[in-house]
Amino acid sequence: MEKKVEYIKENDKIVLMCNYGFRDMTLNLLKCFEKLSIDKSRYILYCMDDKAYQFFAEFKGIECQRFSRDDIINSSTSSTQLFHDNNTNDNKGIYSENAESYGDIGFRAICNEKPLVVLDVLKKGYNVLWTDTDIVWKRDPFIHFYQDINQENQFTNDDDIDLYVQQDDDDICAGFYFIRSNQRTIKFIQDSINFLNPCIDDQIAMRLFLKSQGINIKSKNILLSLSENDKKDKIRYRLLDKKLFPNGTNYFNLKITQRDNITPFIIHNNCIIGHRSKKDRFIEYGLWYINDDEIDINSNINNDDENNKEIKLFKNVLKNHTDIITSINSSDDGKLFTTSIDKSIKIWKFENTSGNDTDNGIFKVLKSKYIHKRGGIWSTFIFSSNNNNNNDYGFENLLTSSHDKTIQYWDNNLQVIQTFIGHTGIINQLIVIPNSSYFFTCSDDNTIRQFDLNNINFKRVFIGHNGWVSSIAINKNLNTLYSCSNDGTIRFWDINSGRCLNIIKGNQGGWIRKIIYNDNLNQLISGGNDGTIKIWSCDNLNNFNDNQYLLKINTNENSSINDLQFDSDTNLIYCAFENGSLKSFKLTSNNNNNNNNNNNNNNNTINYSLDKVYQGHLNSSINCIHISKSLNLLFSGGFDKQIKSWDL
């Protein structure tokens, strides 16, 4: 065993970064750290997307940081003198969570985020050992930096060298280097960042500025001969030995390390294109230390999780809105419609990258428009198109309601056909009676209103709630409207007359946040401020009372419910919470009456069980969810300004 004390320094940090597609390479490198007894406190792992962060932080229990370009730019350590007048290239949306290949624009975009992280850590006073993740470590490189090089060259001070950098085939390699924190190196990285663009990556920039700002310290004599100006301004760099720090060409092709029977410090699996090729080459040379099940989400679930149920990882992240997501809908042809407090509606189209399903592809914005200029959009309804050949956007008409207290009716080019007014408060939801021209809205003004698309003069107002009306649902067969409110009640209304038929107290923490109607079983489902779900039979409205619910679901979430969706094909209730949780519950028939948490005063015939736990909106309220049968996906939108998709 080699000594560790001399080369482990508190202000040295190993820094690495990965996206979800390279999680296996990163795990392979971390396995090397484990073999070398490199303590977790010595390295910082940055995750470039939510999926990678969730994988490492939650499923693997590995401490990591979610990379945020905005956070780094706005941090006190990185903001000064960082960007030129035109700013650096914003790489958001250019790279994805998938494995990128050399030469692709996504690959260069990822490369150009790397120096931002390095600069941020340098400015915090740490020396940085940057390592790409397509590298394996056979020995701790710090032994070479602090012991071997110093002894061979009689360097007396650890900081005699500013930069130790790996050699590539023709110049330096930006995939592995150790750089000390000082004014010279900070300026070097800053200048490199300011030179980046979509065609120039970090390696090209670093090579360029090292030629003008650096001196190659090949021996102590060169170090001693430096002028005072050079000592002050020039980066003193050292090229790492090609045999001890081989790149892909030198190790796998020329085999210069193996020819001398040397154990290298690292092996860089570059100079080969494609993630699959890198992995195959590692396997061929016995340098792959993990199993495929270690990167499989389902095999990494914590068995101590609630009821040992499956934890679902989201498939796609849709980022384009600049504020809270308020509603999600989809058309029959698979277009996705999202709205936000940012006053815009966005239409998304799924594009396959390979294969024929949503396992391979991304969502791209097909159209975006700001449509309620005086308030955020809160609810939408899509009238799907019957003739897709004449409509690029997958809908015939669109209804939107807003914080500006209006409802807008749009054509398929997002031009306003009609504006409906009447509410004096924020409109929380709108629903449409199927195969009719009538629609209903509920508002913070404590009322529900009925409108007619074909008759602007038709209006009916449902008055009775003593607080804002948060949600409504329709039973078309019984001509009944249901509503819930922060006054703690659920009301049943006759659609034809506007008369209130019944009032029940939900006893769900005061504010009843959401109700949905189950057509198949003639049941009403309510979600409360206390995190419970109740199911009510609508068979006998006149004899309804507060305790006559069929089933009470204790979600085990100390958080209020924001949205509910019911999938009649699978009998699953999807439930979104204020604390960022998302769960599904399975409803099953039970004629023996030993359901969980049922009201024993009723002849209960249903039972429930936790089906899945969906994790993705970390510490951010989920505002809305949507089941898309055309895409076979569940979507969620949150206060984090993101939409995420999940397999149904």
Curated annotation (Swiss-Prot):
GO BP: culmination involved in sorocarp development; post-translational protein modification; protein glycosylation; SCF complex assembly
Keywords: Cytoplasm, Glycosyltransferase, Magnesium, Manganese, Repeat, Transferase, WD repeat
Organism lineage string: Eukaryota, Amoebozoa, Evosea, Eumycetozoa, Dictyostelia
Entry-linked SMART domains: WD40
Cofactor note: Divalent metal cations. Mn(2+) is 4-fold better than Mg(2+).
InterPro entries assigned to the protein according to its UniProt record, in alphabetical order: G-protein_beta_WD-40_rep, Nucl-diP-sugar_transferase, WD-F-box_domain-protein, WD40/YVTN_repeat-like_dom_sf, WD40_repeat_CS, WD40_repeat_dom_sf, WD40_rpt
Pathway: Protein modification; protein glycosylation
Gene3D superfamilies: YVTN repeat-like/Quinoprotein amine dehydrogenase
Domain notes: Consists of two domains: an N-terminal catalytic domain and a C-terminal domain, not required for activity, that is predicted to form a beta-propeller-like protein-protein interaction domain.
Taxonomy, superkingdom: Eukaryota
Note: Not required for growth.
Gene Ontology terms for molecular function: fucosylgalactoside 3-alpha-galactosyltransferase activity
Family that this chain belongs to: Belongs to the glycosyltransferase 77 family.
Pfam families listed in its UniProt record: Nucleotid_trans, WD40
Activity regulation behaviour: Stimulated by dithiothreitol (DTT) in vitro. Totally inhibited by EDTA.
Gene: agtA
Biological role stated in the UniProt entry: Specifically catalyzes the transfer of a galactosyl residue to the hydroxyproline-linked saccharide on Skp1 protein (fpaA/fpaB). Catalyzes the formation of a Gal-alpha-1,3-Fuc linkage, leading to Gal-Fuc-Gal-GlcNAc-HyPro143-Skp1.
Activity sensitivity to pH: Optimum pH is 6.4-7.4.
Entry protein name: UDP-galactose:fucoside alpha-3-galactosyltransferase
